Curated annotation (Swiss-Prot):
Binding-site residues for ATP, renumbered to this chain: K253
Family per similarity comment: Belongs to the class-I aminoacyl-tRNA synthetase family. Glutamate--tRNA ligase type 1 subfamily.
Organism lineage: Bacteria, Pseudomonadati, Pseudomonadota, Alphaproteobacteria, Hyphomicrobiales
Motif residue range(s): 'KMSKS' region: 250-254
Protein name: Glutamate--tRNA ligase 1
NCBIfam families: gltX_bact
SUBUNIT field: Monomer.
Organism annotation: Brucella ovis (strain ATCC 25840 / 63/290 / NCTC 10512)
EC number: 6.1.1.17
Annotated compartments: Cytoplasm
Reactions it catalyzes: tRNA(Glu) + L-glutamate + ATP = L-glutamyl-tRNA(Glu) + AMP + diphosphate
GO terms classed as biological process: glutamyl-tRNA aminoacylation
Gene transcribed to yield this protein: gltX1
Segments carrying motif 'HIGH' region: 9-19
InterPro entries in the record: aa-tRNA-synth_I_cd-bd (IPR045462), aa-tRNA-synth_I_codon-bd_sub2 (IPR020751), aa-tRNA-synth_I_CS (IPR001412), aa_tRNA-synth_I_cd-bd_sf (IPR008925), Glu-tRNA-ligase_bac/mito (IPR004527), Glu/Gln-tRNA-synth (IPR000924), Glu/Gln-tRNA-synth_Ib_cat-dom (IPR020058), GluQ/Sye (IPR049940)
């Protein structure tokens, strides 16, 4: 058996960090088991689904390193769903209902008043053909419900009916179908709700494992019933915990909360995003994995907590810095060249500045510092300005090396009597225009004698 998983986003908005957790969990599970990953767009809502969102999802996944083995669109598979609908109707497992939303709400309140579970009472099963025809003559169109197998022979005598599965994340799970309403699978306008196309596609595409958020746990009991009604063996399920904002609010792709695109535009490394999305809310320590292979080594569905996990952007900042500070030159080289940073001193430059980067784009600033004019004029007091001028008069001749900074500052210390911060800070400001940054012993060699002299105040 080939392990086959799927990620099925709705292209009605941009995917956020929570969706990323699901996509990466499926991708890593498939990778660790030599399996296949299907990207399946749940675009049956033709009014809200947009191609621009589908394209954005593809771009986001590619940026994260998730490359599908197969891409499908549910909007192109309506004929397949129609056949499944007819199969369920023929088996007497899909029945027509005509209630309006207001009528259903009144019935729900009535059941609550009678201390009964607020589930659908299957009143539509009692309708005669003549009554159905009369309702349709009024202009009503039926929606179609799936008859849950929570009874022996009389659908109005429901009884406790347990659906069991061994969840990859949560362990043994049980759902009682008697506590649930028969789900609507087909709307009045003939369009499909999520449940039916999802099951039909999982069967047709040979999906063996479904890994998704734990907000689908109850829904799994219904879907297992539909799998069996269509004559298929249900796949293995795994339900990971959900991510929330730092304040505990749920993430929504429609509000753009922590969307993958916004994180990319903010300059985060894809592996920083992937590492946090996968490792947060698990028993694993949250560290930055340099690549997907390394992240896969730490990926274990059994390590996921059953409680929701709060996504803290400050953790993402720390992971991003960690990746940049450890990034070897060969990995950074193509990106440096794209920014015009190349030549004999490119490697020594990268090794000098990487430890001070929050975002990769920060290298452009430091390249300007070592190879051009200062982006900002140094803010030196009169006394410090005189000190720097004296210090620059003591600059040693080239060639310079890693010891030049030490020998120069020792000479300046002897000549001026300054030491510590009073010595180093004015020199840093004069050389870089900033109070903080990479080691000056490394930067001085990169700046060179002539450019250093040009910065004499």
């Amino acid at each position: 058996m080939t392990v086959t998983v799927r990620f099925a986003p709705s292209p009605t908005g941009y995917i956020h960090i929570g969706n990323t957790r699901t996509a990466l969990s499926n991708w890593l599970y498939a990778s660790k088991n030599n399996g296949k990953f299907i990207l399946r767009y749940d675009d049956t809502d033709v009014e809200r689904s947009k191609d621009e969102y589908a394209q954005a999802i593809a771009v986001d996944l590619d940026w994260l390193g998730v490359r599908p083995d197969r891409v499908e669109y549910q909007s192109k598979r309506f004929d397949i769903y129609a056949k499944a609908v007819e199969k369920l109707k023929t088996a007497g497992l899909l029945y027509a209902c005509y209630e309006t939303a207001d009528e259903l709400e009144r019935r729900r309140k009535l059941r609550l008043a009678r201390r009964l579970p607020p589930v659908y009472g299957r009143e539509a099963l009692k309708l005669t053909d003549a009554e159905k025809a009369a309702l349709e003559a009024e202009g009503r169109k039926p929606h179609w419900r799936f008859l849950l197998p929570n009874f022996e022979s009389d659908p109005f005598a429901t009884q406790r009916t347990e659906v069991h599965w061994d969840d990859l994340v949560r362990g043994p799970q049980t759902v009682d179908l008697a506590s649930m309403s028969d789900p609507i699978l087909v709307r009045e306008d003939g369009t499909y709700l999520y449940t039916l196309p999802s099951v039909v596609d999982d069967i047709d595409m040979g999906v063996t494992h479904i890994i998704r958020g734990d907000d689908h746990v109850t829904n799994t009991g219904v879907q297992i019933s539909i799998f069996k009604a269509l004559g298929a063996t249900p796949p293995v399920f795994g339900h990971h915990n959900l991510l929330t904002t730092i304040s505990g609010e749920g993430l929504s792709k429609r509000t753009g909360a922590l969307s993958v695109g916004s994180l990319r535009e903010a300059g985060y490394e894809p592996m920083a995003v992937a590492s946090l999305a996968i490792l947060i809310g698990t028993s694993e320590s949250v560290t930055a994995a340099p690549d997907m292979a390394a992240l896969a080594e730490h990926f274990d569905l059994a390590s996921i907590s059953k409680s929701s996990a709060k996504f803290d952007p400050s953790e993402l900042d720390a992971l991003n810095r960690s990746l940049l500070h450890e990034m070897p030159f060969e990995k950074a080289k193509p990106r440096l060249e794209a920014l015009g940073i190349c030549g004999a001193k490119a490697e020594s430059f990268w090794l000098a500045v990487r430890g001070n980067l929050d975002r990769f784009s920060d290298v452009s600033h430091w390249w300007q510092v070592v190879s051009g004019d200062l982006p900002e004029a140094p803010d030196l007091s009169g006394e410090d300005r005189d000190f720097v001028r004296h210090a620059f008069d003591l600059l040693p001749p080239e060639p310079w090396n890693g010891q030049t900074w030490k020998s120069w500052t020792e000479a300046v210390k002897s000549a001026t009597g300054r030491k510590g911060k009073n010595l180093f800070m004015p020199l840093r400001l004069a050389l870089t225009g900033q109070a903080h940054g990479p080691e000056l012993a490394d930067l001085l060699v990169l700046v060179g004698l002539e450019r250093t002299k040009s910065r004499r105040p």
